[in-house]
């Protein structure tokens, strides 16, 4: 009878050990997936950082060019403003008549 009890206990232990091994394999797979996603997300974040840095540099360069052009051509801006004013006056006159 002790042999039968021993074999039942061994059988129970084997089933529990197999269940634990399956859970451990599942956790290892989950851990691997998390690691893969972290690497992928890190790559995406690095690409976004590079893109934002490039965009910031482009905006800074455009801003400095705009500032230089505004300082250099005051008479051009006056002519553009005068042309717009004349356009709106003529538009309003034609709209009324």
From Swiss-Prot:
Localization per record: Golgi apparatus membrane
Domain t-SNARE coiled-coil homology: 7-69
Top-level taxon in the UniProt lineage: Eukaryota
Bilayer topology: Single-pass type IV membrane protein
Lumenal side: 95-97
Biological process (GO), any one: intracellular protein transport
GO MF entry, a single one: SNAP receptor activity
Chain ranges passing through the membrane: 75-94
InterPro entries, per database record: BET1_SNARE, T_SNARE_dom
PROSITE patterns: T_SNARE
Keywords for this protein: Coiled coil, Golgi apparatus, Membrane, Protein transport, Transmembrane, Transmembrane helix, Transport
Keyword Iron part of the UniProt annotation: no
One Gene Ontology term, aspect cellular component: Golgi cis cisterna membrane
Record topology, Cytoplasmic segments: 1-74
Further remarks about this protein from its record: Multicopy suppressor of sed5-1.
Reported function: Vesicle SNARE required for retrograde transport within the Golgi complex.
Subunit-structure text: Component of a SNARE complex consisting of SED5, GOS1, YKT6 and SFT1.
PANTHER family, per database record: GOLGI SNARE BET1-RELATED
Record's protein name: Protein transport protein SFT1
Species of origin: Saccharomyces cerevisiae (strain ATCC 204508 / S288c) (Baker's yeast)
Gene: SFT1
């Amino acid at each position: 009878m002790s042999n039968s009890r021993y074999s039942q206990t061994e059988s129970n232990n084997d089933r529990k050990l197999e269940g634990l091994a399956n859970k451990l394999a599942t956790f290892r797979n989950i851990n691997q997936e998390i690691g893969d996603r972290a690497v992928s997300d890190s790559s995406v974040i690095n690409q976004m950082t590079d893109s934002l840095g490039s965009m910031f540099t482009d905006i800074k360069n455009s801003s400095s060019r705009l500032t230089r052009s505004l300082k250099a051509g005051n008479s051009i801006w006056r002519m553009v403003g005068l042309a717009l004013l004349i356009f709106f006056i003529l538009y309003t006159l034609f709209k009324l008549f």
